[in-house]
């Protein structure tokens, strides 16, 4: 049995695992391993869990003979450090600060966490990150990028998105959000420094 584990909180992990196992049993999906040990993850599961070509997956086994594939996020591995770093940046900048990988919000400070934490990022934000674009915009601007998949957050009108790059690979972004204050040169330099620091942390 293959159990696909999304990189989420434990409650969502349990619920999603149950749903995916039920889905596999209900549809009767079976995949054979080829002579190189490869197995195809069905397109439906890849779409649901946002697994893309080239995404790293961790492989685990348990005592019952199950093989567990877990999406790997280098930024997510920072855990408490990412949370503390977001808090420090929020205090320094005076803005809502988010640290994201290419799937979801990993850490947030300066705002109601329920509004952002562990929420999926929007396809537009994922595209901007992958293109390594630095975005400074206000709602209504042509280059404004919604942060969340559903974009129901109304606590910000201005944004500054700075990609995190490590060893040539883009891993996520540092995001500053503000309700009424436009981002300037100071915020830009702070975000660049913060993104560079996190990128170096990933190399260790």
Regions found by a protein language model. Name each.
Residues 37-49:
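Short beta-strand-centered segments at strand-helix junctions
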Residues 86-92, 97:
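Short regulatory alpha-helical segment in sensory/regulatory domains of signaling proteins that mediates
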Residues 115-150:
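Regulatory sensory and allosteric helical modules in signal-transduction proteins
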Residues 96-108:
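Short hydrophobic alpha-helical segments used for membrane anchoring or interfacial signaling
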Residues 79-88, 119-126, 172-173, 177-204:
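Juxtadomain coupling helices with adjacent low-complexity linkers
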Residues 158-165:
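A short, aliphatic-rich beta-strand micro-motif
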Residues 3-23:
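Short, Lys/Arg-enriched N-terminal segments with co-localized hydrophobic residues
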């Amino acid at each position: 049995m293959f159990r696909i584990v999304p990189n989420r909180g434990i409650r969502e992990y349990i619920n999603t695992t149950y749903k995916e196992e039920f889905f596999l049993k209900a549809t009767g999906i079976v995949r054979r391993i080829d002579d190189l040990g490869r197995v195809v993850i069905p397109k439906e599961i890849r779409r649901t869990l946002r697994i893309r070509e080239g995404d790293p997956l961790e492989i685990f086994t348990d005592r019952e003979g199950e093989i567990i594939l877990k999406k790997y996020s280098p930024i997510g591995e920072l855990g408490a450090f990412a949370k503390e770093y977001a808090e420090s940046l929020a205090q320094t900048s005076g803005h809502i600060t988010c640290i994201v990988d290419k799937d979801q919000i990993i850490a947030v400070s300066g705002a109601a966490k329920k509004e952002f934490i562990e929420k999926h990022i929007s396809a537009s934000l994922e595209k901007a990150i992958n293109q390594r674009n630095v975005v400074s915009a206000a709602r209504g601007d042509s280059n404004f990028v919604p942060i969340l998949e559903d974009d129901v957050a109304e606590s910000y009108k201005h944004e500054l998105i700075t990609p995190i790059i490590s060893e040539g690979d883009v891993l996520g972004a540092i995001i500053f959000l503000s309700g009424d204050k436009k981002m300037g040169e100071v915020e830009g330099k702070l975000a660049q420094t913060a993104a560079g620091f996190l990128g170096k942390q990933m190399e260790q």
